[in-house]
Amino acid sequence: TILEFTMHNQVLNILLKYMVHMKTQQSFARNEGDKEIVERIQQWFDRFESALQVLLDEKSIHLEYDYKNYNFKIRQEGREPFEFSELSDGYSSVIYIVSDLILRMDKSWLLGEEISQYNAQGIVLIDELETHLHIELQKKILPFLTKFFPNIQFIVTTHSPYILNSISN
């Protein structure tokens, strides 16, 4: 629906602004000689990039920061760089879920506190997780979420046998 599309785009735009903010903070920290902050922010980006590689099932994927336009693109071997908004509905839905969780976990970082490594504890409810996901993505989504967010308990409703069979517990 139009409302879903608008919400997905809003969260994606917030995530991209957040990532630009992190790159800016990393540059300031580098200029100030704060190697610890530089490294921790780099670890955040490395982990996010690794998650994209797993999610998109493509090891050649890398994030590309366009500092002139304050934007991130996804670079894949043998393909022109593309924007997050160019992902299919299925991948966009997963990025929406991941972005929402990242932003909620990292909200404290925006307030000047510890940088999250996605290890916050909590419970997340997702209704009909299979919506917009093709079969291969349905098979990967729960293992991906539980690996990327190890301390989150996911409670999911689904009609998909692929999601149900994708995880042992």
Regions found by a protein language model. Give the residues of each.
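Coupling/switch segment of ABC-type P-loop NTPase heads
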Residues: 1-55
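Accessory N-terminal region flanking or inserted into the helicase ATPase core
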Residues: 37-48, 56-57, 71-85
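Residue-level recognition of short, structured coil/turn motifs
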Residues: 53, 57-58, 150
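Short beta-strand
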Residues: 62-66
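Switch/communication elements of ASCE P-loop NTPase nucleotide-binding domains
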Residues: 69-169
